[in-house]
């Protein structure tokens, strides 16, 4: 297991996609793929934590694998649109730390 930054992950995915003539799919096609992968993750969550058990004939996929699939497609989408996920993360955390700073009940420090 390595400590990869989001920048490292984006570069690794870009190198992988870059070896194929087809390159990145269109943003619309990647949104369809992302929706598909999110559906597969939702199915796993539902089977593990919901009321709907798997059929005996269904493969047992891991949550880690499904989250990895979602991450891969999200990175592809960001790369194709030239979006730094580190910068996007920083912006959203700033938003949460300012807009939502008093929205939730904070834990007492030291607990």
Curated annotation (Swiss-Prot):
- Bridged cysteine pairs (disulfide): none
SUPFAM superfamilies linked: all-alpha NTP pyrophosphatases
Q: Which InterPro entries match?
A: MazG-like_dom, MazG-related_YpjD, YpjD/YvdC
Pfam families referenced in this protein's UniProt entry, alphabetically: MazG
Q: Give the highest taxon in the source lineage.
A: Bacteria
Q: Assembly and partners?
A: Homodimer, or homotetramer.
Its recorded name reads Uncharacterized protein YpjD
Gene source species = Bacillus subtilis (strain 168)
């Amino acid at each position: 297991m390595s400590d990869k930054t989001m920048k490292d992950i984006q570069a690794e995915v870009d190198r992988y996609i870059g070896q194929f003539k087809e390159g990145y799919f269109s943003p619309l096609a990647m949104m369809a793929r992302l929706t598909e992968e999110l559906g597969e993750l939702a199915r796993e969550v539902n089977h593990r934590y919901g009321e709907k058990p798997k059929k005996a004939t269904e493969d047992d996929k891991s949550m880690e694998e499904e989250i990895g699939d979602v991450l891969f497609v999200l990175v592809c989408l960001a790369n194709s649109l030239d979006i730094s996920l580190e910068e996007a993360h920083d912006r959203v955390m700033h938003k949460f730390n300012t807009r939502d700073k008093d929205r939730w009940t904070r834990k007492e420090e030291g607990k």
